[in-house]
Amino acid sequence: MCEDKKTDSRSQQECQKELEELRERLKDLENEIKKKEEEVREYTSHLQRLQADFDNYKKQMEKQELEIIKNANERLILKLLDVYEDLERAIENQDSSMDGLEVIYRKFRDTLTKEGLSEIPAEGEKFDPFLHEAVMVEDHDGYEDGIIIEELSRGYRLNDRIIKHSIVKVCKKS
């Protein structure tokens, strides 16, 4: 190297050349460091995106799991709805000696309600194809067009999800 000019036998030109080579090498190394730093930033960014994607995936899976648990009883409740409605009709047509049947009906209704079951309002409401299924239409003076005249079969929600649409008769003006 050209550290000591007196003891060094190389010429000034050789020292300049060596210095230029070292500067060039330093520049190459600095460029390589910049490239590696950029790679590190890219890998870090990619890793952060993967982590965010994984966190979102976990949240989605937890949400789906809760939804599955929440609606796990849907099939059973659908089967029980016919019994529930039959009990209701029996109570409507009973005489006063059938108080026990009414107690059973209320207990059954309360159990279904606690499990997340709710009735869909129909009669007098505006027809909504997401909630109701129209099987009949009729021109009726007492109702506006598109209003439900009669509920033929009740509809139900289970935890905000429609599990049975109301079967209805709708007013349709001619």
Swiss-Prot record:
Its main location: cytoplasm. Keywords: Chaperone, Cytoplasm, Stress response. It is found in: Cytoplasm. InterPro entries: GrpE, GrpE_coiled_coil, GrpE_head. GO terms for molecular function: adenyl-nucleotide exchange factor activity; protein homodimerization activity; protein-folding chaperone binding; unfolded protein binding. GO terms for cellular component: cytoplasm. GO terms for biological process: protein folding. Belongs to the GrpE family. Homodimer. Participates actively in the response to hyperosmotic and heat shock by preventing the aggregation of stress-denatured proteins, in association with DnaK and GrpE. It is the nucleotide exchange factor for DnaK and may function as a thermosensor. Unfolded proteins bind initially to DnaJ; upon interaction with the DnaJ-bound protein, DnaK hydrolyzes its bound ATP, resulting in the formation of a stable complex. GrpE releases ADP from DnaK; ATP binding to DnaK triggers the release of the substrate protein, thus completing the reaction cycle. This is Protein GrpE.
